[in-house]
């Protein structure tokens, strides 16, 4: 595992007394430990090669806060709310199932690597990342063909475009990718806007799933009002915690897929809690992404076995593993500052919602 230069003097422990003294909101008052982690990825993903975040410890155990660095304060504040929900203790939720079907995530890798990933996972559903770039379309199609071959005819293939296509490109690409995949279960966020998703959904036979149009939108219900999606992708952290995600699922009224955001096992457990608590779950969930991290913070790591995550999965944080992934002083200082900014943004958001 490559070690960043920052790890040579790794500390990772945020000074709690200093954090409390600077937190004018009181949101972090019951947090008794905050540890910044920094982990390499096994393969580049979304243009990054490392993932970092902070684990918060409180009366309820560990919670994770890990918004990507290109997210602004408003988009990142719900991630703190989610981490605090975990660390301060969730109220008990119903459990409707003992296992969760989980997809294997296939990054933008070559066809052979894609095939190997699918076969090794044992999953019956594959989520394949595709590029927004026209010069990479042939590689996308080859990857999809390889995934279908590895899954066999009975498996399900879905693609994730992260809103990279305009409407015309989506109309052109989706039929090609549907054919290469031997039939797509759905296309996740092929276009960025709800208007384009709605137009595309009327123009093609491939079901449409909404991700960014839910978690980054000021009005997520617009996808329902405009009939822009067949499936809702729910990510706990960007929605502000399990309870808010459950509420969103109910308000949307669409079949839901619970997904993660390159989380450690601590973050995955928040997603698993949501998936176990949804009254209906008809699609495989995207909760197998710890495989994309070169290391983890829990032992055992929360990973699906043959495409299934069990109810008894847990995320016991290992001090030994935590010591191996603690961030260096530079990143630790940045996360302490960011936590305080997030607390301010979350406090302001809650004040607005209370009016």
What does each of the following model-derived ranges do?
Residues 126-136, 156-163, 182-194, 206-216, ...:
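Catalytic beta/alpha-barrel core
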Residues 133-147, 165-169, 190-201, 217-219, ...:
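Active-site-adjacent beta->alpha loops and helix N-cap segments on the catalytic face
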Residues 37-39, 105, 211, 259, ...:
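Conserved beta-strand termini and adjacent loop/short-helix elements that scaffold enzyme active sites
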Residues 219-221, 225-321:
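Shared catalytic-loop signature of beta/alpha-barrel
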Residues 121-124, 151-153, 175-184, 201-209, ...:
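Glycine-enriched alpha-helix->loop->beta-strand junction motifs that scaffold or abut catalytic
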Residues 40-42, 108, 214, 262, ...:
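Short, solvent-exposed coil/turn elements at secondary-structure transition points
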């Amino acid at each position: 595992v490559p070690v960043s230069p920052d790890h040579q003097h790794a500390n990772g422990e945020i000074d709690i007394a200093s954090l409390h003294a600077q937190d004018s909101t009181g949101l972090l008052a019951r947090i008794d430990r905050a540890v910044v982690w920094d982990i390499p990825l096994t393969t580049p993903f979304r243009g990054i090669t490392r993932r970092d975040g902070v684990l918060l410890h409180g009366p309820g155990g560990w919670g994770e806060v890990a918004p990507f660095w290109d997210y602004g304060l408003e988009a990142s504040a719900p991630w703190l709310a989610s981490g605090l929900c975990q660390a301060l203790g969730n109220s008990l939720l119903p459990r409707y199932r003992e296992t969760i079907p989980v997809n294997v995530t296939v990054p933008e890798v070559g066809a052979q690597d894609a095939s190997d990933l699918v076969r090794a996972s044992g999953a019956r559903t594959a989520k394949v990342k595709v590029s927004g770039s026209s010069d990479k379309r042939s590689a996308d199609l080859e990857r999809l063909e390889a995934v279908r071959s590895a899954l066999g005819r009975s498996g399900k293939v879905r693609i994730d475009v992260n809103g990279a296509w305009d409407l015309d490109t989506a109309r052109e690409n989706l039929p090609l990718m549907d054919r290469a995949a031997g039939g797509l279960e759905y296309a996740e966020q092929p276009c960025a806007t709800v208007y384009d998703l709605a137009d595309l959904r009327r123009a093609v036979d491939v079901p449409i799933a909404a991700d960014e149009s839910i978690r980054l939108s000021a009005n997520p219900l617009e996808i329902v009002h405009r009939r822009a999606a067949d499936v809702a992708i729910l990510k706990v952290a960007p929605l502000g915690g399990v309870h808010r995600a459950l509420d969103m699922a109910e308000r949307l009224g669409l079949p839901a897929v619970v997904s993660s955001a390159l989380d450690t096992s601590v973050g995955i457990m928040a997603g698993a809690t949501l998936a176990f608590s949804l009254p209906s779950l008809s699609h495989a969930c995207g909760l197998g992404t710890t495989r994309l991290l070169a290391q983890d913070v829990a032992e055992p790591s929360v990973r699906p076995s043959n495409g299934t995550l069990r109810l008894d999965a847990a995320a016991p944080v290992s001090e030994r593993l935590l010591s191996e992934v603690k961030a260096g002083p530079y990143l630790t200082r940045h996360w302490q500052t960011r936590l305080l900014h997030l607390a301010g943004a979350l406090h302001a958001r809650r004040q607005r919602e209370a009016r």
